[in-house]
């Protein structure tokens, strides 16, 4: 239960906001992994399989805004404006698979390069759905004035033609589905020469697909997103030891930031972000 009181500087009115809600969260994350040595001190394979689930529920959020009636002398002098009821449920699923291979070469006592390669796959999906209900206090059988306790306002016996009218304000934009898929492969080499030269080079390829189905903020225009990209990310890291205290290093790498599901939704809802 949250109660706020302050000034709306746009309308120059004293306002109150009453909010009652319950939230439920469920989270699971699990992994299975293994390491297999094919030849001792020469090559090995490791792998990991993972799954994660997360959900967030608001089964009944009640919100009441009230405004100070400056012409009313008796208490309470705040009248109810724009009560609403809100329900939402969000579910996320994620599955991943990774495998890596390592092979060691022995060319000489000072030069023993190591070759690495691997693949990675990830799939994520999200479903979000919400419902909104507004309350019209147009009847004559309910007092619009109350002092913080608005629990009675939402009672079933107050919903009638002569008291409070209840209307659904849910639109198509109050729900969406989204998913993404990532497939990656890499190869890298560690080329160290004694204690003088340390060099690591590699390249990673990523295929990424992001899908989203929803509606524009007004709920009238369907929005379908299907973005596909293929990127290459080279990396180089070379260090040359001039002495035990001094070295020269050169490095280069490339990366990318990808949007979260909520960042591609074509409308803004502060309630579920």
Question: What residues fall within each predicted segment?
Answer:
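Outer-membrane beta-barrel domain signature, strongest for Gram-negative TonB-dependent receptors
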Residues: 1-114
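Structural signature of Gram-negative outer-membrane beta-barrels, strongest in the C-terminal barrel
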Residues: 22-33, 50, 88-100, 104-163, ...
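Accessible peptide chain termini
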Residues: 1-2, 270-273
């Amino acid at each position: 239960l949250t109660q706020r009181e302050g000034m709306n500087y746009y309308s120059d009115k004293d306002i109150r906001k009453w909010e009652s809600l319950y939230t439920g969260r469920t989270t699971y994350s699990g992994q299975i992994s293994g390491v297999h040595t094919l030849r001792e001190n020469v090559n090995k394979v490791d792998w990991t399989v993972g799954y994660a689930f997360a959900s967030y529920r608001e089964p009944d959020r009640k919100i009441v805004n009230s405004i100070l009636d400056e012409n009313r002398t008796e208490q309470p002098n705040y009248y109810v404006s724009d009560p609403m009821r809100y329900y939402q449920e969000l579910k996320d699923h994620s599955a991943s698979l990774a495998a890596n291979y390592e092979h060691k070469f022995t060319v000489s006592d000072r030069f023993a390069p190591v070759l690495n390669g691997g693949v990675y796959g990830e799939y994520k999906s999200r479903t979000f759905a919400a419902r909104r209900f507004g309350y019209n206090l147009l009847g004559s059988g309910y007092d619009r004035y109350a002092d913080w306790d608005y629990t009675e306002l939402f009672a079933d016996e107050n919903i009638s033609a002569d008291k409070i009218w209840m209307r659904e304000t849910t639109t198509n934009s109050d729900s969406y589905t989204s998913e993404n898929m990532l497939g990656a492969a890499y190869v890298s080499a560690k080329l160290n020469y004694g204690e003088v030269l340390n060099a690591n080079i590699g390249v990673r390829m990523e295929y990424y697909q992001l899908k989203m189905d929803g509606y524009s903020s007004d709920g009238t225009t369907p929005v379908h997103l299907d973005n596909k990209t293929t990127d290459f990310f080279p990396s180089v890291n070379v260090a040359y030891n001039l002495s035990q205290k001094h070295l020269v290093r050169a490095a280069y790498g490339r990366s990318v930031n990808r949007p979260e599901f909520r960042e591609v939704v074509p409308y803004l809802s502060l309630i579920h972000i």
